[in-house]
Amino acid sequence: MGGISIWQLLIIAVIIVLLFGTKKLRGVGSDLGSAVKGFKKAISEDEPAKDAKKDADFVPQNLEKKEAETVEKQKQNDKEQA
């Protein structure tokens, strides 16, 4: 009905094998397999990096906490000057 039947796919596969040969197709298949394997490896290595700290020297602080510390330091400086 408009779709491709199994026989049509089989004929296309035979034509491709005749055009390129089994050796070339085997090489393409192994290249494709290694590319997929490398992609999966890169994805699996990237996931633990999300849990790790981004920078060892950087500790994120809230702006409110930083402002409170600044106000406390100013109060201590005022007391020392007085």
UniProtKB/Swiss-Prot annotation:
Membrane topology of this protein: Single-pass membrane protein
Membrane-traversing stretches: 1-21
Primary location: membrane
One BP annotation, GO: protein transport by the Tat complex
A single MF term (Gene Ontology): protein transmembrane transporter activity
Highest taxon of the lineage: Bacteria
Pfam family, one: TatA_B_E
Alphabetically ordered keywords of this record: Cell inner membrane, Cell membrane, Membrane, Protein transport, Translocation, Transmembrane, Transmembrane helix, Transport
Cellular location(s): Cell inner membrane
Disordered: region residues: 46-82
Disulphide bonds in the chain: none
Subunit-structure text: The Tat system comprises two distinct complexes: a TatABC complex, containing multiple copies of TatA, TatB and TatC subunits, and a separate TatA complex, containing only TatA subunits. Substrates initially bind to the TatABC complex, which probably triggers association of the separate TatA complex to form the active translocon.
Homology family: Belongs to the TatA/E family.
Chain's role: Part of the twin-arginine translocation (Tat) system that transports large folded proteins containing a characteristic twin-arginine motif in their signal peptide across membranes. TatA could form the protein-conducting channel of the Tat system.
Entries under NCBIfam families matching the protein: PRK02958.1 (NF002813), PRK04598.1 (NF003396), tatAE (TIGR01411)
Designated name of the protein: Sec-independent protein translocase protein TatA
Organism: Aliivibrio fischeri (strain MJ11)
Origin organism lineage: Bacteria, Pseudomonadati, Pseudomonadota, Gammaproteobacteria, Vibrionales
